[in-house]
Amino acid sequence: MIYYLIALFVIAIDQLSKWFIVKNMELGASIPIIDNVLYITSHRNRGAAWGILENKMWFFYIITVVFVGFIVFYMKKYAKTDKLLGISLGLILGGAIGNFIDRVFRQEVVDFIHVYIFSYNYPVFNIADSALCIGVVLIIIQTLLEGKKMKE
């Protein structure tokens, strides 16, 4: 299915970008892309967003394996007839596996996209995180659209 190719694309871009950061930037180094808005910052995270559950790799291994299994099951069962759901799940699957690869082989996740939103210093994130978030937002949009259709 095409949705697995979306996941593979996300994994490839995610891992390539992380490899580039690790090989070419010192930890903590930052390159401004748009001053006071967007930076490429070499950062490592041993937990989830905002450092939640730091150094609890066993927890992330278990949760990710279960989550990936659920996503694959859901893709096989429902994505065949629902294009937007398939794209969403492909993005989520790719993001989950991208960060899982880091946790297994590095014992930490490489983050590098650093954004300041209205002067708020948002936590540094990566391509996998972005794919996960976009996938979730697409599912929310689809759910809202389906709810609207049911009312009509």
Swiss-Prot record:
Known EC number(s)? Answer: 3.4.23.36
Location of the protein in the cell:
Cell membrane
Q: Which residues are connected by disulfide bridges in this protein? A: none
**Keywords (A to Z) from UniProt:** Aspartyl protease, Cell membrane, Hydrolase, Membrane, Protease, Transmembrane, Transmembrane helix
InterPro entries per UniProt: Peptidase_A8
Where does this protein chiefly localize?
A: membrane
Which BP terms in the Gene Ontology apply to this protein? proteolysis
Q: Where is the active site?
A: 111, 129
Which pathway does this chain act in? Protein modification; lipoprotein biosynthesis (signal peptide cleavage)
Look up the domain of life of the source.
Bacteria
Q: Which residues cross the membrane?
A: 55-75, 85-105, 124-144
Q: Which reaction does it catalyse?
A: Release of signal peptides from bacterial membrane prolipoproteins. Hydrolyzes -Xaa-Yaa-Zaa-|-(S,diacylglyceryl)Cys-, in which Xaa is hydrophobic (preferably Leu), and Yaa (Ala or Ser) and Zaa (Gly or Ala) have small, neutral side chains
**Which Gene Ontology molecular-function terms are recorded?**
aspartic-type endopeptidase activity
Question: What this chain does, per the record?
Answer: This protein specifically catalyzes the removal of signal peptides from prolipoproteins.
**Family note:** Belongs to the peptidase A8 family.
What is this protein identified as? Lipoprotein signal peptidase
What organism, scientifically named, is this protein from? Answer: Bacillus cytotoxicus (strain DSM 22905 / CIP 110041 / 391-98 / NVH 391-98)
